[in-house]
Structure formats: C-alpha cells, structure tokens
Amino acid sequence: QAFLKRYDGQAVASTFRSVWLPAVARRQDWSTLLANWAPTENVGLRCAQLTARQATGKADAQWTSEAQDLWRKAGKSLPDGCDAVFAVLQTQGGMTDALRWERVDAAADAGQPSVMRSAARGLPAADLALATDYASFVDAPSAKALNWPRNERSRRIATDGLQKLAKANPDATEQQLPQYAQALGLSADQQAQV
C-alpha cells in the first residue's frame, strides 16, 4: 500500500495495482482491495471489486447497476470470478429476462453461441427454446430460422449467423440469403451486412 501511495498517479503504480489486486482478491482480503481500488477495464478485477463490496455489506443499488452493466455488455465469456457476482444478482432479483436477452444479443454479435446459451439459462421455457435456436443458428445456420418470429431480434441473429457463414462459405450464404430475407423481413442494410 505504501508503494501505491508513493507512486500514485504514475504508470508503475497502475501496473503494480493490476498485478497485486488479483492476489489480494484470491486471499479474499476485501477491505484491502476496496481501500486500494482504482477504476479499471479489467473485467476480472471489476468482478473482484463487486464481490468485495457484496462481502462487506455494500451491495446497494449502485452495486446492482454496475453488476448488470458488466453482464449486459459482455458478449464473450467472463472470468470464473464473476460467477458469484451474478449469482448474488440473481438472488436479489436483479437478473431480469430483459437483461438475459441483452447478453444473448451481445453474445450473438460477438459470434459466441456458448455464451448465448449460458446467458439464456433462467429464461421462461419458450424464450429459452428460442434463445437456444438462435445460438444454434449462430453456430451453424439452419432452416429452423425460417419459422422464427418476424421481429428485429430474429433479423439481428440471422444477420449475425449469416455473416459468420459468409466467412466460411460465401457461396452457400449467397444461395440461402434470399429465403432468410423473405421469411424474416431482412432489410436491404441487413442483407448488405451479410
């Protein structure tokens, strides 16, 4: 801590903090972590800070908002250290269906079908089935999509899946695009994205 105070504001302090705070989190020394916290883009450290706040009785409305923000913006898999944060968020009623869908959408945009499936757990059965279909399509487009609801989310997922297919097999994508465009009402812009 003395090192951080001595070199506060310098790059060396930031580098030291990014190495030292994960060790503090592994020891579950929450008060030390919170006392030496500085905002960071490191998702693992952000989850550790949220865990520290929750463990010290500071899981307030701001905590909920920050945990939800971390969840919704993560289109890719998150560190295991975030699992406890999201479990508490679920227990406190902060993990809404709309929030789950936001992460499903972000994961689709990132081309991460496994994250889509994981984010969808906890949705009502019909929504879970649709989200699973969406994830399967992003993984490998199929004709099942022709029966999806004709809404913006379906169009977005179809565009994401077809973009991925276009990288691997442009000819197949070119042949299949018209049927998806017609069935789901893809706009000219969405078709051009593919």
PLM regions and their residue ranges:
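Alpha-helical solenoid repeat scaffolds
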Residues: 1-194
